[in-house]
Each structure stands twice: as C-alpha cells, then as structure tokens.
Amino acid sequence: PNAPKYLNTPQTLLYDKSSNIFGLSQAKNEIRKTGFAVVVEGNMDVISSHQVDVRNVVATAGTAMTVNHLKALSRFSNDIRLCFDSDQAGINATERAISLGQQAGVELSIITLDQSAGQAKDPDELIQKDIELWRKSISNPQPAMEWVFDQYQKRLDISTAKGKKDFSTIALKLVENLNDPVEKDFYINE
C-alpha cells in the first residue's frame, strides 16, 4: 500500500536526467499552441494529463529541476507553470525551481492543486477525481513571487514583530534577486 507509483530510472553515462524532459517530444507542439508549458514531478502525471487531452504537460523525469530543463522548455514558450506534488518535498522543489527560473530568464508561475478534490496530492490523483478541476487549476496559476510570499506567510507568525522581521528579510532577499526592474519595483512597493 505504501509502494511508490513508479521507480525512477537512475542517472547513467547514457541517460542524463538533468537534461531530459519526459514527454517533451509529445508536448512541444501543444506548448507552442497554448503558449505555456506545465511541468509536473511524475511521469504518471504526464501520462494521465495527455490521456485527458491536456497535452502541454511534461515532467522532470524524477530528478530536481535544472536550468537546462528550463532553457530547453523556453525554446517552445517562456511561460512555464510548475505543478509539483503538494507534499513538503514538492513545496521545497518549487521553491528551488523559482530561483532557477530567474537564472534561466523564464516566466514562472505556480499551479496549486485544488484541495476541494479530496486532497489530491499530485496531478494524476486530481485527474482521476476531477478532470475539470485539473483544467481549471492549469488556467489559474499564481505568479511565483506571490506563491512564495504566501508560503512564508503560512510558516511565519506575521502578527509578531519577529515574524514580520523574518518575513521582510526573506521577501527582500527574494525581490533583490529579480531580474526585471518593473517586477522588482512592484514587489518592493508591496
């Protein structure tokens, strides 16, 4: 019952996981057509999504996202939407990917799985429960910086001086790393 859905292929000399994107050859035309790519964690998430005609979905093939992944995707669209699992590992992976997105010069946004669908922990589970909620979730991503701010507001008690100070310190570090001066100015004024 606690077995994984699948076991990831290990990295080898012939198979470089940091450069390969699962499902990209099947998704690239749809990514161009829709104007955005959806990146998920698992291969099953990609397969389930393609089976319900949401075909602009790819996966990082069981490895952490890299700048190489983002640069490869940016050949088809600069709008990249992340939908990693809703567990702590997925949240951590999303946070790491946001800084990589800034390095790669892509526009990242975050898809949060609609929790009204019986606590689906990944896209595959959500698709099995409610295909329309999956489509709706993809259509309503949250800008990456806003997602990060929301995460830290949940973790820190911003009703206290220490919580506000910690949040401000984290937020300023994130904003300082932004490349776009308009975006940087917007968040500084927030």
Predicted feature descriptions by range:
Residues 1-76, 80, 93-94:
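Phosphate-handling DNA/RNA-contact segment within nucleic-acid enzymes
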Residues 20, 42, 66, 90, ...:
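Active-site-proximal structural scaffolding
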Residues 27-30, 43, 76-79, 97-104, ...:
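Generic, well-ordered alpha-helical scaffold segments in large soluble proteins
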Residues 44, 65, 85-94, 114-120:
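Acidic, metal-coordinating catalytic cores used for nucleic-acid/nucleotide bond scission
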Residues 70-73, 99-101, 140-144:
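Flexible glycine/proline-rich, aromatic-decorated loop/lid segments
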Residues 80, 88-103, 107-114:
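Phosphate/diphosphate-binding loops
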Residues 106-190:
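C-terminal or mid-to-C-terminal helical accessory/interaction module adjacent to the motor/catalytic core
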